[in-house]
Amino acid sequence: MILPIYLYGQPVLRKPTEDITPESLDLKQLLSDMWETLAVAEGCGLAAPQIGKAIRLFIVDGTELAEDYPECQDFKKVFINPEIIEESEEDTTFSEGCLSLPGISENVIRPASITIRYLDENFTEHTETYDGFAARIIQHEYDHLEGHVFTDRISPIRRQFVKTKLTNIAKGKVAARYRTKR
């Protein structure tokens, strides 16, 4: 089922998320719905808060980007209860957008590589290091689990420039090519 994507201004996007267990929800159905929603929205990542769930879960699919970003080859994963345990000292800057903030894209500075510990959809633990665009996608989605959106990471002057757009999104005065909830 295609779920509505919660827009900027929804309290769940700022709420702390909780760890999940195999018993805490119907994970198989939720993941199926999230993958379907992500595909229709044509995004490369979707976090549970973006569909109204304050839980520590996000999915990524960077496979469409692999031609330009080789590190995204076969980069389709589920991250449950993730924890970024290491960040590189080197930073990179890249323009980011977000399904919860349609029509806004801004340059965001992030660590160039990260190491993350997480559980997959079978609740098997992994510790992996990512760099480049794959690391950026993970950090963007991870921010949602921490109650942040990418505009929190832009310069104060740039935030002033997008303030009206953010206000309009929060009021539902925005067009998106996918189902939304304000």
Tell where the protein language model's regions lie, with residue ranges:
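Active-site rim/adjacent substrate-binding subdomains
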Residues: 1-139, 144-182
